[in-house]
Amino acid sequence: IKPNELGATVTHEHLLVDLMCYFYEPEEASKRSFIDKPFTMDVRGELPQIAFNMKANLQYYDIEWSIAEVSKFVNAGGGGLVDTTSMGLGRDSLALCRISRATGLNIIMGSSYYIPQAHPSNIGELSEADITKQIIKDITEGVSDTGIKAGIIGEIGNLYPLSDTERKILRASARAQIETGCPVSIHPGAHDESPMQ
């Protein structure tokens, strides 16, 4: 689809995602009761204090729920959605395709890698060229053997200070951008200096 045909587009969403890379078991006994609780409105007020201690807040796997939510956006005039769930966060090209077909929404899928805690165990073995090639394949041929192509490079997560691996991923992503012309989405860390890295 051409960008001018997308219509109203949300540019940073995660329809299905696994953010367990952020999970940690809380020290406080009162917060431990939330670890395996389902996400319901009655726990919403507690969320700022337990966001990374509650598995249901970090894992979204329900395709039917996503279809229902996306349908609301489409019915309100939405035309496009950028799903920045990158490799290591549970990116699911087949599920995104299913959601798109069920709702008629154009979904732009991401590529590349997020923060180190979400990197695959073999990331250290991959060269910059390997990562560049992988991202380009996602964009030009599709993810795995699905034929479903990524349309954005990212969300690339960064911490502060940048690790050598994060620098390698950023360089590989930049090289893939130069070759494909695909846009890039970078999520800098929370540190004040992080965006300037």
Task: Go through each PLM region and give its residues.
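Divalent metal-binding segments
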Residues: 40-67, 84-88, 155, 159-163
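Catalytic domains of carbohydrate-active enzymes, especially glycoside hydrolases
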Residues: 67-82
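Glycine- and Gly-Pro-enriched alpha-helical subdomains that act as flexible
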Residues: 186-197
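Glycine-rich anion/phosphate-binding loops
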Residues: 60-65, 85-95, 125-137
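Active-site gating/metal-coordination segments in enzymes
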Residues: 80, 98-101, 106-183
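Histidine-centered catalytic micro-motifs
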Residues: 8-17, 81, 188-189
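Active-site gating loops and adjacent loop-to-helix segments of metal-dependent hydrolytic enzymes
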Residues: 14-60, 111-129
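Active-site beta-loop-alpha junctions enriched in small/polar residues
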Residues: 14-16, 86-87, 112-116, 155-158, ...
